């Protein structure tokens, strides 16, 4: 996936959490998150049942994260930077969103990722369908 940031294109290899169980787990217990690795919660909420404000926490998450909240038009609504490991304090999107990306804490600032930047990705099902139709 790519974020068109002010500092240039930022590329991430992100897993996809698209079920309720996967989204509840998130990056809990992960200690080895690489610089350009992340987890995309898409659709958010699972099943795509309408937009809603997102609220995350860092329970059981030993690594600081940047949590990027993404609008339906794929622009960034908010970047919650350097979240506190293990915190149970809610981290809110501030507005309804359709996807959320978690990356290693501090990366958004390093790469110049900010509100309004455009996020682009191919949903796994769409990539598979395109390969089947094209092949």
Q: Where are the model-predicted features located?
A:
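Compact, glycine-rich, soluble single-domain proteins
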Residues: 1-135
């Amino acid at each position: 996936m790519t974020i068109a940031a002010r500092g240039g294109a930022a590329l991430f290899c992100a897993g996809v959490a698209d079920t309720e169980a996967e989204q509840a787990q998130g990056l809990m217990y992960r200690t080895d998150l690489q610089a350009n690795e992340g987890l995309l919660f898409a659709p958010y909420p699972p099943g795509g049942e309408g937009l809603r404000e997102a609220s995350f926490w860092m329970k059981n998450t030993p690594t600081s994260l940047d949590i990027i909240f993404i609008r339906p038009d794929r622009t960034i609504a908010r970047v919650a930077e350097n979240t506190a490991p293990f915190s149970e304090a809610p981290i809110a999107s501030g507005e309804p969103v359709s996807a959320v990306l978690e990356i290693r804490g501090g990366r958004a600032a390093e790469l110049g990722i900010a509100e309004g930047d455009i996020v682009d990705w191919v949903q796994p099902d769409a990539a598979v369908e395109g390969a089947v139709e094209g092949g």
